[in-house]
Amino acid sequence: MLVKFAGLYERVIRLKGGDIAFFSNIYDELQTLADNNIAYEIVPGITAASGASAYTGVPLTARDHSRGAQLLTYYRDTVISNEVWKQLAAFEETLVFYMSSNNLTSIVQHLLNAGAEKNIPFIVVEQATTPNQKVKSFTLQSFSEVPEQDFTSPSIVIMGKVASLYKQFNWFNSDNATAANYFRSVEEETGYLKIQSFIQQKNSEHVNRTKTQIS
């Protein structure tokens, strides 16, 4: 599609949620562009780990809590070997699991079987940075003792000592007096209907123009 549209239009934008450097197809897409001598520019975004960290008040690194973080994904058993599970269980810093909430029961069990401490805390952030954001807190032990849960997609898991800071510094989903809330979702603004009407109008114009070109 990139090659096709690059041949049709002067400028083409390929949008992706988060940041294209994390868990994306950027390598394949850049290779395709390079093979076809198509010039490109990469604009960085905010990856889910950073967004969820900011909107929960849970830093990925913090003095006396974590000196580093590992970003992983776990969508099937073959992705992580038993040897790697042992390394993760012994890892004393922050673990962040992308696109893995549906397999969280397996993740917790693998870590416990590999010798991880039962009291390691973690949070599951559902729909991070949106007005629908919800956060659920667990420890490895407490999660293993409850029935399997369903989480709203997309969700991200932040695991390690830093997760214990959520209760203290959570500002988005709380009545915390220090929560300034300078930024509000557009739904709360009086101009939302005007913006919605403008977008609908432009979409309608685009559809009509496309129909004319096809006919």
Feature map (PLM): residue ranges:
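Short glycine-cluster motifs
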Residues: K4-Y75
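A contiguous loop/helix-start segment that scaffolds small-molecule binding in enzyme catalytic cores
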Residues: G7-I13, N25, E29-Q31, G68, ...
